[in-house]
């Protein structure tokens, strides 16, 4: 009975971790080719406008350099100039394809994450008994720990998440989540989140220690502050 009681939560947690990912991955792969064909045939005009808006300054500089080169080659045979124009055209088409793929990946990533969210929401609603069982097992495990180990665990977790050396870790995590949703990397947004999110977590943790731990286990709070000092 004890093994069954432990096996069911483990199976439930495993399915939560892997099943949404498998379903979203299958959904993405099955619709990717169809979506690419649809986008290429229906959204070309929107795409070209978007390219001009996003890359106009960069492409002006690049084309200016190419025009200077064109002026230098005016004395060259016509075939050389034709090759130059062909190269410019190919580079422009490649730029359009690159932005096309980025835009499609953004939409596909966002769609698959929405699917994962609905799957996890359904799991939390339909698997209410399993969640209660997992909660009881976690509470029992934490209750059996000594106050010293509890304080050490809290201190280790807080130093990893909101310590002065956790900035690089938050940059990696937020950058990964940002990329997973298909958005282009924006250093200003990531820097803003890194500078504010740990502060919010630190405030929540201090409030939790003050309101909850002081009432439940004052000795744990004393040990925690002693180790923190």
Swiss-Prot record:
GO MF, one annotated term = proton transmembrane transporter activity
Question: Where does this polypeptide localize?
Answer: Plastid, Chloroplast inner membrane
* Role according to the record: Contributes to K(+)/H(+) antiport activity by supporting proton efflux to control proton extrusion and homeostasis in chloroplasts in a light-dependent manner to modulate photosynthesis. Prevents excessive induction of non-photochemical quenching (NPQ) under continuous-light conditions. Indirectly promotes efficient inorganic carbon uptake into chloroplasts.
> Could you tell me the membrane topology recorded for this protein?
Multi-pass membrane protein
Q: Name one GO biological process term.
A: potassium ion transport
**HAMAP family annotated for this entry?**
CemA_PxcA
A GO term from the CC aspect: chloroplast inner membrane
Q: Please give the family membership noted in the entry.
A: Belongs to the CemA family.
For this UniProt record, give its keywords in alphabetical order, as a comma-separated list: Antiport, Chloroplast, Hydrogen ion transport, Ion transport, Membrane, Plastid, Plastid inner membrane, Potassium, Potassium transport, Transmembrane, Transmembrane helix, Transport
One Pfam entry for this protein is CemA
Q: What is this protein called?
A: Potassium/proton antiporter CemA
Residue spans crossing the bilayer: 7-27, 107-127, 154-174, 189-209
Q: Which reaction does it catalyse?
A: K(+)(in) + H(+)(out) = K(+)(out) + H(+)(in)
The gene designation is cemA
């Amino acid at each position: 009975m004890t093994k069954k009681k432990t096996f069911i939560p483990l199976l439930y947690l495993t399915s939560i971790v892997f099943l949404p990912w498998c379903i979203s991955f299958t959904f993405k792969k099955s619709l990717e080719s169809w979506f690419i064909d649809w986008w290429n045939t229906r959204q070309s005009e929107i795409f070209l406008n978007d390219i001009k808006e996003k890359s106009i300054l960069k492409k002006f500089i690049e084309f200016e350099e190419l025009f200077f080169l064109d002026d230098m080659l005016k004395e060259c045979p016509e075939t050389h100039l034709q090759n130059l124009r062909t190269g410019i055209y190919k580079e422009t088409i490649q730029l359009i394809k690159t932005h096309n793929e980025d835009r499609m990946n953004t939409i596909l990533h966002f769609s698959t994450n929405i699917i994962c969210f609905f799957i996890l929401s359904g799991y939390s609603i339909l698997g209410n008994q399993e969640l209660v069982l997992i909660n009881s097992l976690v509470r029992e495990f934490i209750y059996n720990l000594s106050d010293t180990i509890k304080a050490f665990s809290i201190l280790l977790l807080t130093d990893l998440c909101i310590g002065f050396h956790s900035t690089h870790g938050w940059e990696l995590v937020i950058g990964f989540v940002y990329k997973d949703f298909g958005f282009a990397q924006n250093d200003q947004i990531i820097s803003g989140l890194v500078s504010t999110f740990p502060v919010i977590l630190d405030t929540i943790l201090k409030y939790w220690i003050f309101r909850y731990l002081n009432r439940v286990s004052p000795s744990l709070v004393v040990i925690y502050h002693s180790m923190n000092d």
